[in-house]
């Protein structure tokens, strides 16, 4: 996605709000605070956190901690930083809760279809490449002791944390900024949105759009404006991060069962949940699950908006609405709390 573009566009405006935009992690970042006087401090905190995440988790930096694993693990147990351990734990949880629809062991598969560098450097057109069906090695082969900071994975596996890293960063940054500065905050990383603290009156108003575009531009394609007061909103799409090799259109949402770009009736899926990470797990898995996604999301009671390849829109579970549902496996037998189901299954 172009650094000046996003899917979830925070459009709440008021004189008391602080707003700042910049580029990071190969995408567009918007930060909003309910106290305009704290926006500079908040920006410093966010930029510091994003730099640390990039240094730990980037697949496109040869000096990142993640890339060093290719040379140093190879079936051995190695010590990793607390930040990388946390990011890997988030990715493994996503794989578990999505029954493998969101799998972090797709690094080699993404490189094979042409996504082997920051997306801004991926050529839009190129000669045909040999594309082979090859399932992901499988997230179950990764062993992580998060408390001890120890990671073990077989030789030949390349991790890609891109499916969850931005959502993880948004949740982490929003919570940290709220705690440190005692104000409401919204963090949007390429449309993965997390909020924390007291919202502005009427909630955080966000425009969700099918095709990317700048907030000041007239949106292209179907749009929806929603207000969220807590948790997160995430959008997964095959409409922007796409490229052509020969006569084949490729995109970055892979089906772990084939290692190839997912064939889906949905070009965009937006979900609200208790956290941005949970919303992102559900939105990405929905692209992979295809026609089964609406019933699955409805069963989880996760408000969602799905846009078909023809531009048709399907909404489920009361969209537009915020959700306080977090994700866990179906059929775990846990009782529901008095306020209704706080956790919902994902299988």
For each of these PLM feature ranges, what is it?
Residues 1-347:
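Mature catalytic core of soluble alpha/beta enzymes
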């Amino acid at each position: 996605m172009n650094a000046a573009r996003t899917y979830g566009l925070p459009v709440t405006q008021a004189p008391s709000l602080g707003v700042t935009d910049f580029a990071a992690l190969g995408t567009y970042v918007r930060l909003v605070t309910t106290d305009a006087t704290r926006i500079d401090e908040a920006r410093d905190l966010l930029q510091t956190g994003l730099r640390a995440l990039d240094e730990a988790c980037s697949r496109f930096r040869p000096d990142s901690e993640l890339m060093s694993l290719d040379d140093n693990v190879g079936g051995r147990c190695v010590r990793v930083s607390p930040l990388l351990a946390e990011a890997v734990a988030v990715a493994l949880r996503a794989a578990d809760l999505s029954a493998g629809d969101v799998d972090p062991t797709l690094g080699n598969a993404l490189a094979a279809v042409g996504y082997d560098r920051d997306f801004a450097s991926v050529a839009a057109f190129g000669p045909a490449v040999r594309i082979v069906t090859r399932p992901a090695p499988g997230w179950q082969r990764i062993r992580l002791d998060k408390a001890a900071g120890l990671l073990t994975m077989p030789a030949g596996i390349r991790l890609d944390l891109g499916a969850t890293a931005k959502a993880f960063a948004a949740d982490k940054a929003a919570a940290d900024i709220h705690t440190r500065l005692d104000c409401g905050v919204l963090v949007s990383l390429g449309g993965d949105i997390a909020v924390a603290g007291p919202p502005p009156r009427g909630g955080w108003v966000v425009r969700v759009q099918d095709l990317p575009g700048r907030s000041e531009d007239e949106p292209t394609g179907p749009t929806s404006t929603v207000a969220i007061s807590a948790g997160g909103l995430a959008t997964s799409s095959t409409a922007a991060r796409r490229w052509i090799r020969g006569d084949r259109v490729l995109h970055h949402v892979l089906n772990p069962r084939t290692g190839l770009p997912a064939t889906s009736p949905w070009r965009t899926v937006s979900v609200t949940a208790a956290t941005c990470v949970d919303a992102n797990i559900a939105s990405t898995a929905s692209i992979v699950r295809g026609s089964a996604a609406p019933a699955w999301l409805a069963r989880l009671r996760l408000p969602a908006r799905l846009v078909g390849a023809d531009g048709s829109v399907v909404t489920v579970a009361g969209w537009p609405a915020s959700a306080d549902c977090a994700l866990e496996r179906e059929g775990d037998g846990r009782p529901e709390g008095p306020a209704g189901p706080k956790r919902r299954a994902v299988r």
